[in-house]
Amino acid sequence: MEEYEAQLLVVEQALENAADEAQRQDLLALKNNLQELLALTRDTGDEAHTDELPQQGDDLDDELQRLKSELSDLEAVGSSQTALDEERQLADLRTKYTAMVGEKCSAPHEHSWGTCYHNALICGVDDEVVMNSEGVLDARLRVLFTNPTHREMLPCSYYLEGECRFDETKCRFSHGALVPGSSIRKYNPPDFHKLSRSRPVFALLPDRLWHRGRVLCVNFVEQVCRVRLDGQDHKERERDFKFEELFPLTTDQDEDDELSSEESNSSMNDDSSDEAESDMDDLEEARRARMVELSLFTFKPTERLGAWEEFTRGIGSKLMEKMGYIHGTGLGSDGRGIVTPVSAQILPQGRSLDACMELREAANGDKDYFSVERKLKRAQRRQRKADEKAYVRESQRVDVFTFLNDSVLGPGESSQQGEQVAKKIKTNELQQHSTKTLNVETVRIADEIRRKQRDMAKVKQSLDRNSGDAQLQKRLQVQMESHKQELATLQAQERSLSKEQQTRKSKNKMFEF
């Protein structure tokens, strides 16, 4: 049939190129014959095809059935093998997860704003099998969060004791969150050395929830930190927390510091010795700056380290300063040592340690019961009381100065009253004092009289200068009267002393021969 079609094609090409009319007639007749022959050949082929079609259809059905049976056999074998592999994989996972029960980890928790990781404790393995994000079978772990920030994360205390009457869906507290095992991360322990001012932290409040806040100051000696809590619902926003009640949060600065430390380590390995020394200098400066900052935000102790050196030359502090110590920071290379000096204690002589402990327990466990400083302060208090008693005794003694002040000087006395008081002075009382004491008192009173006269002259000048101001004139008149009274008293006292001195001189002349 293909040969006939090829011949027909050749005849058609020759017919197009033929120029003679007789030749064209012959080619047309040949073309018609070939077309009829092709038509007959096609009809014969269709009849033969219809006769063989049922037999070929049966062969195809059989072949299709065999193919389906082979595919089903292969699928059955593959599914059984896959099931065995999955069961083996799940068994290995359960064995691995069962060994992790009781360990600490970091587990995800779905919040309204997204997923956040919190420290948790693995308490069991769930029986249900889940498919993780990569399409691999995985088991779920039941975890209890150690730092719950929301009520749905707070573990049920009755569930932990096995006495909760509600199931997981009805209880208001958590019976353990179910998380895929593949999402578990490494436990993030709290690093209290990172505590510094403005550091974000989680703080434990009485409601057993951890609330967010920021550090105000840190006391590494007492391990106490003052935190300002976020939010307006806290009556006392600033509170003191112990270190075990805090969880420092990681910031971007910490990640940058870690990256910079890694880069500095790699650069120190690659660079020359000169660059390594410069890096070490930078690290030393950063360390000193860190220690200074640490000293600024540390609770100030009651006593300064080295306060006893005010009685010495302070050679100890000078040596420590040369060795790199920064005043105000703790001892040690990182400045996190003690700040308060260690108090010396003296135990009773000839007593055993058990007897000393009994004495301390009898004093309600006072740690400073045998402290040397406490004994010194007690001795100082006794000495202070003795000094006060001596002062009272000395103040009760009457000397010439006290006698003159009490007897002669007095507020509101006029010149005439001063004269009367001076006349009433007993001669025997003045005779009790020595001539030297009387001379000193005479000089002192003379100075007081001259000073008082100068004050009166100044007040008189003020009166003359401010004659038009009535109120000021009144105040100046009062001052003038007061100065006159004091001057009269001093003059009376001076006359009394002069009289006593003159009497003594007269007696001395009487005894001279």
From Swiss-Prot:
Basic and acidic residues bias: start-end ranges: 455-467, 496-513
Biased composition (Polar residues): 468-480
Domain of life of the organism encoding this protein: Eukaryota
InterPro entries: G_patch_dom, Znf_CCCH
Parts of the chain that traverse the membrane: none
Organism: Drosophila yakuba
Biological function: Transcription repressor.
G-patch domain boundaries: 312-358
Taxonomy of the source species: Eukaryota, Metazoa, Ecdysozoa, Arthropoda, Hexapoda
Biased composition (Acidic residues): 252-261, 271-283
Gene3D superfamilies reported in the protein's UniProt record: 2.30.30.1190
Alphabetic keyword roster: DNA-binding, Metal-binding, Nucleus, Repressor, Transcription, Transcription regulation, Zinc, Zinc-finger
GO cellular component: nucleus
Zn finger spans (C3H1-type): 155-178
Protein name, entry field: Zinc finger CCCH-type with G patch domain-containing protein
